[in-house]
Amino acid sequence: MKYLAAAIAAGLAALAASYGNGKVISKTIEGMARQPESANNLRATMFIGVGLIEAVPILAIVIGFLILFL
């Protein structure tokens, strides 16, 4: 049962993070198309946002390992 819980935690976190990354990147590209002069600022902000979004599945994988081994 704990194997299933770890798989669900990691799978749902990865699914949510990929959806979030897609939304962030698509809105950034849309903003760059509208205002090309602010592309550098948008790109930097996008990388910060993507990094914060990617922290969630990493934490979910750590929690999954804790479920498995503790």
Swiss-Prot record:
Key word Cell division present: no
Residues under site feature: Reversibly protonated during proton transport: E54
Pfam families linked: ATP-synt_C (PF00137)
Chief location category: membrane
Entry's transmembrane regions: 5-25, 50-70
Keyword Transferase included in the entry's annotation: no
Superkingdom assignment: Bacteria
InterPro entries given in the database record: ATP_synth_csu_bac/chlpt, ATP_synth_F0_csu, ATP_synth_F0_csu_DDCD_BS, ATP_synth_F0_csu_sf, ATPase_proteolipid_c-like_dom, F/V-ATP_Csub_sf
Subcellular location field: Cell membrane
Keywords in alphabetical order: ATP synthesis, Cell membrane, CF(0), Hydrogen ion transport, Ion transport, Lipid-binding, Membrane, Transmembrane, Transmembrane helix, Transport
Membrane topology field: Multi-pass membrane protein
GO molecular function: lipid binding; proton-transporting ATP synthase activity, rotational mechanism
Leader peptide range in chain numbering: none
GO cellular component entries: plasma membrane; proton-transporting ATP synthase complex; proton-transporting two-sector ATPase complex, proton-transporting domain
Family per record: Belongs to the ATPase C chain family.
Subunit-level organization: F-type ATPases have 2 components, F(1) - the catalytic core - and F(0) - the membrane proton channel. F(1) has five subunits: alpha(3), beta(3), gamma(1), delta(1), epsilon(1). F(0) has three main subunits: a(1), b(2) and c(10-14). The alpha and beta chains form an alternating ring which encloses part of the gamma chain. F(1) is attached to F(0) by a central stalk formed by the gamma and epsilon chains, while a peripheral stalk is formed by the delta and b chains.
Protein purpose: F(1)F(0) ATP synthase produces ATP from ADP in the presence of a proton or sodium gradient. F-type ATPases consist of two structural domains, F(1) containing the extramembraneous catalytic core and F(0) containing the membrane proton channel, linked together by a central stalk and a peripheral stalk. During catalysis, ATP synthesis in the catalytic domain of F(1) is coupled via a rotary mechanism of the central stalk subunits to proton translocation.
Full protein name: ATP synthase subunit c
Organism: Lactobacillus johnsonii (strain CNCM I-12250 / La1 / NCC 533)
Gene: atpE
